[in-house]
Amino acid sequence: MIKIITGRQSDPLQTEIIGRAARNYLAQPGKDTFIIVPNHIKFNTEVAAIGKVAQLQGREETSVKNLHVLSFSRLAWFFFKKADLLMPESLDDAAATMILEQIIDKRRDELLLFKNSHANSGMIKQVYSTILQVHTGQLDLGNLLERAADPAVALDLDNETRDKLHDLDLIYQDFLEIVSEKHFATKDELNIQLNQLLASRPDLVSQASFYVTDFSHFSIQEKMTMQLLAAFASEMTFAFKTADGSVIEPAAGEYDYVVQKTIKDLTGYFSAHDFAWEREKIASPASPARDLNQAWQGQGQPDLNNLQLVKADSRYAEAYFVARTIYDEVALKGCQYRDFLVLAPNLQEYETYLAPILRQNQIPFFDDLQQQMKYHPLVLLLENLGKLLQQAGDTPALLSIMKTRLLIPDWYLEGDAEAGEAAYLRDIDQLENFALAHGIKYSLWQKPLKDFTKAQVIALDQEQYQKWLDRLDKLRDFFVSKISRLARQLKSEKDSMTAVKLFFDFLVKNGVSARLEAWRLKASESGDLQQAQQPEQCWNLLLSLLKDYLLVNPENFAWADFFKMLTAAFSQANFATIPASLDAVTLSEYGMVQTSGYKQVFIIGAANGSLPQINDQPNFLTTENLASLADFFDQDAYLEDSQQLRNLDQEYQFGNALALASDRVYISYPVINSNNDLLDPSIYYKRLLKLVNGREYRQRDLPDIAEKDRTEFARQLLLFLTSPRASLGYLAYAEENSAQSPLVAKLVELSRQYEEEKAEEIAEGMAYDNNPQDISEDLAERLYGKDLLSSVSQLESYYQNSFEYFLNYGLRLRPRAENELNAIQSGNYFHRTFELLLKEMQKKNIEIDKLSELDLELLLKQVRSEILQEPLYQQFLRDPFNEYLFKVFDKTTSKVAQSYRRKQQENKMRATYGELAFGPAEKLAGLVLPLKKFAGQRKISLRGKIDRVDLFNGDQHVLGQLIDYKSSDHSFNLARFASGVDLQMIAYLDVLEKNRDLLAGGRQFDLLGAFYQYVTRKLNSVNSSSTGALFDSKLQLKENLLGGEDKLKLSGVFVSEPAWYQEVDKALEKKATSSVYRGLKLNKSGGFGKKDNFFSQDEMRELLEYVEALIEDAASEILSGQIALNPFRQGNNTGLAFSDYKDIFYFDQQLPTNSYRDLPNLKKADLLALVEKRLRQRE
């Protein structure tokens, strides 16, 4: 007898079917009773079915023998076993992909679409999906193409569809042939073979009863299974949910079109074959769920008190609303955790919110979101082994393998294995540091680590760490030798069986399988059953894939295809999940079939774009292609447009979700996403909002501390409270930000009684101040020494942000060294080039202005060759791209040098010293300043290097100027100097002044200035609106700007003595504008006029005194232990812009305790007034 039971979506059809099946089982315990459900709910349905049997027996627990709860795939396995048939080997998607790639390559010349194009993995996946549809649909593509080509048939296909079918037919036939030869079964083959078995062996089901529920649609083969069971089974019962429980003629666009079409197809078959069947509509009792379902379908507008719409500030607020509501319902109303279901269109978006918040509230939950295998250490090992065979010595791949902890050398595990593993991980970290610092990659991994230490770029390069380096080298050799040996073996091996055995032996002999087993046991012993399953599931899948590969490709081993198959298979694989407890909240994806019996359901993430879930994923045969093929299909052989079916079923599926709760439904959306982009509610949310007359609850991230009414504030606060542990943060926030409230104080006191330690942590967190505390003078002395030895750049960093100075030069924290040619290293290369060029000219007693352009280039070539032989630059040159960059740098230095050569023909200043070092133990004395704060008992010694010092021996005096090379355009900024952020130019002038006798040989020594030399190849823009444009407003060419020569002029701070510049700059004899110094122009009276970067000799002396005061102030504060988070700011430039320590600072200008130290805009007069004031204080 066949029975079709129908009801509304809100009716307990699943419970009804389970009850009937349980009673049938008890009435006929010797016969098989089957409940067929979607695979997703098989476990919960089985629990419910056994529970129902126990209830009918009057027991708390029971066992069953012939009651089976199965999905379609499990049904196939059941009958294969019962018929004593060999179960076919299931073809993995990755193996199928490999077969299809082989077919396409073989047939390429015969194919139309793939003849001249590469079939990527996405396209192969689409083709495979379509092949499965064709196979399941029993479609004869060859016959279809013949019919389309027959002039007598009044049907035609468009060219795109015809070409796709042509290629598909060729690929499909070859695919079936190969699969048949290899004795594989595709993932749809199980249903096909099941149907063949049922058709030939009706005795298998003749005494069985079948109950089918929770389907709204069947695939072609599933529908055939239902037809066969209806024909041969003793009893067949279907349960379907329609709009109002009635069965009507299906019409596309109707609310329940898909399920009505399914019923129509079945009943039509039954009638056509004269099967006895009857239809039963179960009673639909009045309930809140029915009212909501009717309202959703537009059948009346009842009072929807069971529906709560929630507008949340964020996804965090949504998740907290879920947790708080569940907590309250369980704690105050006696609900159980299994009464709650949480659905999300994209559950992955809420993984970082829901799970932590539920755990914090001690709410047990089962997340049925499938966890991907591709992040498991075994999968990472396999994937990166493939990368190393593709490119030997791939550093990220090699380090990833080391970090999997699957290949730990034995010598680490002797004795205490846990301590040994910790030591291994420390060594891996150090080896990674060493490799990144020295740019070790590819073939360089074959070299001993000591070969790289000459560069001296990391602490491990030093002799004192040789033993540690030897240990790291042993570790390097362990991995490199083993992986290289495996690579050689696999690349040379042609026999698949031998190659797979070599690969498997590599894993086993190196302890991978033993390691996985150890992880499994450890997780099992700790009670984490989910984690305990993962190593075994990964290993079993690997074994299955190895077997598949040998079946697909038993002879000609291709290592690239082998690893490609493994990677592809694991990237699509998921871990099987099991609930840790039967009493747990269920988290699931919206759109998946769910069991009944939930009291309250949350649908979160109901934002526009998420609901409805319109599917537009690309398929090989598009909706348009399938529409043009529709006329060629018949009742028993066709292709379904599954995408269109899903889209047509959206409102029905949402109705299913609404009907899952017997008591209450919550629907929420966040107003912003994780990127702080504004979100609109879903059209479904808006539709329901109208039904409840705009009744909407607003879930805030935090209680509203602006609420003045104490009663209302208390009410709001209570809505955030759950367990003492989870509530403490909100209570601390309320206590901190609201007026004194007896309620808040009492709640805080109660929470502290349960969570004293957590309360202290939160109190500390609320009082957290990211501003550092000063250290004692004793500790400062231990960090810096009794006297401070420092450089100008270090003191500048102190004035830029003193906390950074402490981290860098006090604690000596450094970012990890990496072998990259960054801006600092490029600047060093420029400096080194000009330094050696000057030394070479002095060695050969050559004046640069006497050299020809070619001679200078030859000299530069010699210098560059010498530089690139240095260990550091040899290390950089291991990267081919760096070799290119050095050539670019060389063009820049050539341009600057040639410009200098030309200008020296008009300038009498001569480069005398390059990279002139000063300070203790140097020929040139540094600044040594006693510190008044310490009564002169302590001092600061300044050391450093001046890029270049130029001298001119005149009749009356010696003039000196210093040059500082810069990779970006610089000018002397008064505010930055006044604040100490830019000390360099004036401090270096002070050093020259202090060494006047040495530099001038006892003669009169005068400072000309300190200048920046911009090292650049930049040109001026043709159409720029600035003064640097090549053409003026009358479109006249500015010849002085050609080639960007103006950018190479010296700029900086000038001593305002026109006569001195006329002494050294010959161009000033002919014109008022200097060709060497930017901005230097004589006026009619022979002076410079008023300019902020020109200072008289007396003013310059004041600046030199002022810079000493700044140096002394900084040193005194450093040695006193003063530390402050006080970054400067000037326009868009801040003391944090290029900092390596931002993650330590946590600087946030929104915090009341964090603020920038803004530099004022200063004119020359302002600066001099400031200088005079400070110097008076110093006296």
Swiss-Prot record:
<keyword id="KW-0238">DNA-binding</keyword>
<dbReference type="GO" id="GO:0004386">
    <property type="term" value="F:helicase activity"/>
</dbReference>
<keyword id="KW-0547">Nucleotide-binding</keyword>
<comment type="function">
    <text>The heterodimer acts as both an ATP-dependent DNA helicase and an ATP-dependent, dual-direction single-stranded exonuclease. Recognizes the chi site generating a DNA molecule suitable for the initiation of homologous recombination. This subunit has 5' -&gt; 3' nuclease activity but not helicase activity.</text>
</comment>
<keyword id="KW-0347">Helicase</keyword>
<dbReference type="InterPro" id="IPR027417">
    <property type="entry name" value="P-loop_NTPase"/>
</dbReference>
<dbReference type="GO" id="GO:0003690">
    <property type="term" value="F:double-stranded DNA binding"/>
</dbReference>
<keyword id="KW-0378">Hydrolase</keyword>
<dbReference type="GO" id="GO:0008409">
    <property type="term" value="F:5'-3' exonuclease activity"/>
</dbReference>
<dbReference type="InterPro" id="IPR038726">
    <property type="entry name" value="PDDEXK_AddAB-type"/>
</dbReference>
<keyword id="KW-0234">DNA repair</keyword>
<dbReference type="InterPro" id="IPR049035">
    <property type="entry name" value="ADDB_N"/>
</dbReference>
<dbReference type="InterPro" id="IPR014141">
    <property type="entry name" value="DNA_helicase_suRexB"/>
</dbReference>
<comment type="similarity">
    <text>Belongs to the helicase family. AddB/RexB type 2 subfamily.</text>
</comment>
<keyword id="KW-0067">ATP-binding</keyword>
<dbReference type="GO" id="GO:0000724">
    <property type="term" value="P:double-strand break repair via homologous recombination"/>
</dbReference>
<comment type="subunit">
    <text>Heterodimer of AddA and RexB.</text>
</comment>
<protein>
    <recommendedName>
        <fullName>ATP-dependent helicase/deoxyribonuclease subunit B</fullName>
        <ecNumber>3.1.-.-</ecNumber>
    </recommendedName>
</protein>
<dbReference type="Pfam" id="PF12705">
    <property type="entry name" value="PDDEXK_1"/>
</dbReference>
<keyword id="KW-0540">Nuclease</keyword>
<dbReference type="GO" id="GO:0005524">
    <property type="term" value="F:ATP binding"/>
</dbReference>
<dbReference type="GO" id="GO:0016817">
    <property type="term" value="F:hydrolase activity, acting on acid anhydrides"/>
</dbReference>
<dbReference type="InterPro" id="IPR011335">
    <property type="entry name" value="Restrct_endonuc-II-like"/>
</dbReference>
<dbReference type="Pfam" id="PF21445">
    <property type="entry name" value="ADDB_N"/>
</dbReference>
<keyword id="KW-0227">DNA damage</keyword>
<keyword id="KW-0269">Exonuclease</keyword>
